[in-house]
Amino acid sequence: MIPTTERVFQIFKELNQIPRPSHHEERVSDYLCNFAERLNLSYKRDKENCVVIRKPAAPGYEKAEPIVLLNHMDMVCVGMSNPQTTPIEAYVEDGWMKARGTSLGADNGIGLSMALAVLESKEIVHGPMEVITTTNEEDGMSGASQLGPDFLKGRKVINLDSEDYDTITTGAAGACLQFHRIPVEFKPAPEGLWFCVRFAGGLGGHSGVDINKGRCSAVKASCYFLNALRRKCSFDVASIRMGEANASIASSAEVVFCVPADASGIVEDVERLTNKWIRENFGVADPGMCCGVSPCEVQEMVANADSLAALISCLEQVPQGVLKMSETMADTVETSNNIGRVMTEDGCIFVSTHTRSFIDQDMDALSRRIADIFASCGAKSETVMSAPAWQEDQHSAFLQLTSDCFLDVLGWRPRMVAMHFVLEAGFFVEHFPGIQIASIGPRIVEPHSTSERVELSTIEDIWHVLIELLRRLAVPE
């Protein structure tokens, strides 16, 4: 008897008790190794904590071609007081699974749970199988980018990291993640009135999937506020914290600043002006975003004026959002940029930018342009991750078989589309010659945000499509 999705949900619940932000995947990597040991399956763990678990073919299918199930173990943690210790409290409402006040981790925890349920099952028909789970997919892809050539044997890959239930993802934009650091010196704070301006209520979202939805970036809104304030009075800044993750549209920000004693009215005027600007530009697409100013405690140190001016100049010049729509793929963003995080650190102001494009040359050119903007203000830029774009042949036998399984199981064919977010597939194509990849998954809405949710019925459907696809692939070479 084919197992139901009940076990998938049980595994997902177990995963969500393990905090797994990017760069801190040791515990979930341990979980995967223990999972393999419990099933007496061979596994390998590399220095990046990536894990591949190998399962022999079902009896009678030993000569079939090896099949790979691909997922990542990290998640974007939003709304958590401490991402390294806070578990996720999931609940079901109106046919959707959601989380209370945090991101859910369905990206990519549901796909990983499916893969582990397949490993556990003795009823599912499949050939030799490898389940590979990578690290740091959400913030640099260092796991996939550093895989050794002997880590994987299979050349047909089912990636379970898609978020569009009615599609087979057959391509993904390339991406370049850059960190920029503006040198800063701190000096004793002057006398004056202290305030904290906070931006909150924004929808945020995935900086690839949601970049074309016209949402307000809390970084750009903060820049507007600071620019408007400096046109009316002098001020000093003690601390900056904008954005939640490099791969998310910033939905919140906080700046602590000081103004002269007679400038309280100016601060109130700038607050009103900023909220007016937000309403006029984002009132429909992001109605909850707002700016609020409140008095705060006196701070001891402030950033030097030149560094603050350099930051504002850079944030003004660096583009945010869609730069170009594709001329060959309908309703598809070709090139975009997102300013993910801005914060004061020891000796610098840190800024992250995430550039995406289906054209590698355009991505490289835009990344260089952004680095040049920061360089002109004395900043140093570092490319943390550069992933190539990926495009499969939509007429390949593997993709057609995947499409056939949707038709036979669900009664309809999915669309084959290229998506404006980076997938690890680009690195797999580079590392493993001859590899073919199809990416499928349940419907996940607003990933990388506290509104993240997954539709339960689509998990059921994708589970049965996956089982049928594995069965049909389990034929002798």
Language-model segments: which ranges?
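Acidic/His- and Gly-rich active-site-bordering loop/insert found
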Residues: 2-96
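Active-site metal-coordination/substrate-binding segment of hydrolases
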Residues: 61-155, 191-194, 308, 316-319, ...
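Acidic, glycine-rich active-site loops and adjacent beta-strand->loop/helix elements
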Residues: 73-75, 132-140, 161-165, 203, ...
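Midchain, well-structured core segments that form catalytic/ion-binding scaffolds
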Residues: 93-98, 102, 137-139, 144-356
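His/Asp/Glu-rich mid-to-C-terminal helical/loop segments that flank catalytic regions of hydrolases
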Residues: 215-232, 261-263, 306-316, 324-327, ...
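Substrate-recognition/cap regions that form aromatic- and gly/pro-loop-enriched pockets
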Residues: 332-419
